[in-house]
């Protein structure tokens, strides 16, 4: 018997559309929470595939980095040119608890600061906070005209630039190495370090637009859940009852 195709068999209809499944039905929304050092805690939402088999949704979320405008976190448009990076470290329920991961300026702000007839001074230094976070801070400053100055330009001499840069690194080292990451974040928001540099360098050459333009996280310590929960205003300690001390009494069996 010859083996081959049987043309008389009914063929399946070609061109039938396959049933398309919406990929969003397999995903869940999670709320991103900013640390308590910022005024606005609800940053936004993120999508992740649901937990299936060995793939855990929490593992997919941990380590995610989100970039948020500081103006949104502080509810102040004056901070619109600064961007904050937050890293997801822990997932509790539908909330992603984040920690500070870095800070940067928008490119349009940096370009607007650079002008003619003035000197640009930059400095960067690697510091370690008291809670063992290794950070690299980048500072930027510009010279300005002295009072009653007639000369058009405000160029600083090479020796003055070196002296200013040395002062900048000293102040950044002092301010950053004597506090925790949370305390440093609190200093960066109102630009305390920039004002300190401006005051300290008045005797060398007057400065303007002094900013910590970038903060880069190089190394983080071992993850501590308790520290993260404290950062978010929560606690991981369980409420325990008070221990009651009672005298030991030996049971005496009655004779039958």
From Swiss-Prot:
It holds the Pfam family Ribosomal_S3Ae. Its main location: cytoplasm. Keywords: Acetylation, Cytoplasm, Ribonucleoprotein, Ribosomal protein. InterPro entries: Ribosomal_eS1, Ribosomal_eS1_CS, Ribosomal_eS1_euk. The keyword Cytoplasm applies. The modification N-acetylalanine is found at residue 2. It is found in: Cytoplasm. The keyword Ribosomal protein applies. GO terms for biological process: translation. One of its GO terms (cellular component) is cytosolic small ribosomal subunit. It comes from the Eukaryota. One of its GO terms (molecular function) is structural constituent of ribosome. Belongs to the eukaryotic ribosomal protein eS1 family. HAMAP family: Ribosomal_eS1_euk. Component of the small ribosomal subunit. Mature ribosomes consist of a small (40S) and a large (60S) subunit. The 40S subunit contains about 33 different proteins and 1 molecule of RNA (18S). The 60S subunit contains about 49 different proteins and 3 molecules of RNA (25S, 5.8S and 5S). PANTHER family: 40S RIBOSOMAL PROTEIN S3A. This is Small ribosomal subunit protein eS1. It comes from Botryotinia fuckeliana (strain B05.10). The gene is rps1.
């Amino acid at each position: 018997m010859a083996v081959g195709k049987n043309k008389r068999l009914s063929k399946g209809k070609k061109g039938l559309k396959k049933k398309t499944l919406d990929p969003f039905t397999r995903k869940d929304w999670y709320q991103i929470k900013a640390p308590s050092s910022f005024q606005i805690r609800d940053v936004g939402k993120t999508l992740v595939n649901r937990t299936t088999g060995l793939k855990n949704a929490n593992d997919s979320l941990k380590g995610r980095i989100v970039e948020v405008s500081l103006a949104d976190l502080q509810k102040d448009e004056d901070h619109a040119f600064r961007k904050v990076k937050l890293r997801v470290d822990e997932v509790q329920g539908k909330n992603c608890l984040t920690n500070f991961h870095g800070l940067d300026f928008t490119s349009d702000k940096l370009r607007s600061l650079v002008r003619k007839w003035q000197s640009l001074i930059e400095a960067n230094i690697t510091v370690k906070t008291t809670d063992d976070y290794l950070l690299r801070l980048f500072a930027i400053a510009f010279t300005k005209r002295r009072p009653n100055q007639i000369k058009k330009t405000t160029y600083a001499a090479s020796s003055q630039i070196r002296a200013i840069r040395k002062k900048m690194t000293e102040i950044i080292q002092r301010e950053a190495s004597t506090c925790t990451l949370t305390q440093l974040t609190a200093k960066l928001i109102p630009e305390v370090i920039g004002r300190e540099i401006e005051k300290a360098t008045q005797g060398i050459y007057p400065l303007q637009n002094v900013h910590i333009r970038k903060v880069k996280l190089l190394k983080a310590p071992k993850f501590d859940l308790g520290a993260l929960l404290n950062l978010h205003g929560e606690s991981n300690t369980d409420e325990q009852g008070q221990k009651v001390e009672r005298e030991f009494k030996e049971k005496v069996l009655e004779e039958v």
